[in-house]
UniProtKB/Swiss-Prot annotation:
Subcellular location per the Swiss-Prot or TrEMBL entry: Cytoplasm
Top-level taxon of the source organism: Eukaryota
Entry function: Maybe involved in N-terminal acetylation of proteins. N-acetylation plays a role in normal eukaryotic translation and processing, protect against proteolytic degradation and protein turnover.
Subunit structure: Heterooligomeric.
The enzyme's E.C. designation: 2.3.1.-
Protein name stated in the entry: Putative N-terminal acetyltransferase 2
Keywords carried by this UniProt record: Acyltransferase, Cytoplasm, Transferase
Misc remark: Present with 1240 molecules/cell in log phase SD medium.
Gene Ontology terms for molecular function: acyltransferase activity
Organism in which the protein naturally occurs: Saccharomyces cerevisiae (strain ATCC 204508 / S288c)
Chain spans, region Disordered: 68-90
One Gene Ontology cellular component annotation held by this UniProt entry: mitochondrion
Amino acid sequence: MMVPRISASPVFKRIFLRWGFVTLPIQKTVSHTLRRDFSAPCRSMVKCLLLRPGISVHSAQDRKFYSTEEKSSQFDENKSKSNNGKKNEPHGIKGLMAKYGYSALIVYILLTCVDLPLCFLGVHSLGEEKIKIYLNRGKQLIGMGEPDESKVIQDVRRKQAHREAVQAENADKVEDASRKTFNERWQEMKDSTLLAELLIAYGIHKSLIIVRVPLTAVLTPSFVKLLQRFGIDLMKKQKKVFQTMASGAKIRYKGNNPSDFIKNEGTALDITKRKPRTKGQKWFDGLM
């Protein structure tokens, strides 16, 4: 009866894959089993592998790991460079001005002139009573409002009745408006809700910038084409202005020190005499 021999190759593979190095007792036992099961060429090849403990499967895995790590680091560097390039590019209305010139600014100002009055009319159409109620609710958020809204409504109606009575009394009298003192005018402004309406309308107007900028991007190309039909090209004029400014600001160094420079002719701009930015210019940049 033939008894099948169990091959030692699975045992050898387990030992070889678990440890990258093989100790001397394991070498003897494995070589003893190989004498019985493997042929002479296979035994010589396996012995050569066993006598070189420095070679392991982990080395190939480490090479793959480090190669993938290098690729990921290169990808992260390229991604950071692209993100830095995107951050340096202007966005919003400044990006549109860099692309279309002053035409984008004109379209944006026209949309602003339409948007702000519409917001004010929408707020003013609510009426003094509703505006006072909304203002009282806003004050309640910071703990300064009246908890009972009925009192607010009664106060508004009482002031309206008093104002109508004063206007009816002064209807028969010819009174010069210039005789009113500053305190009287300020009291009238405080009693009216025009200032509150204007502030609310301006807040709504600023929140609608997410609508104005896309509308500017949509309408600016057609506006540029319309101007070009009439022979007006604001982009060329803007480039000429910047070219003249750049030619006037040219300098050349006469030494290794960057602060030591010579003006390029009498048309060059004197850097030391440049005026600082005014508050109006800073406000305009913040508004854009």
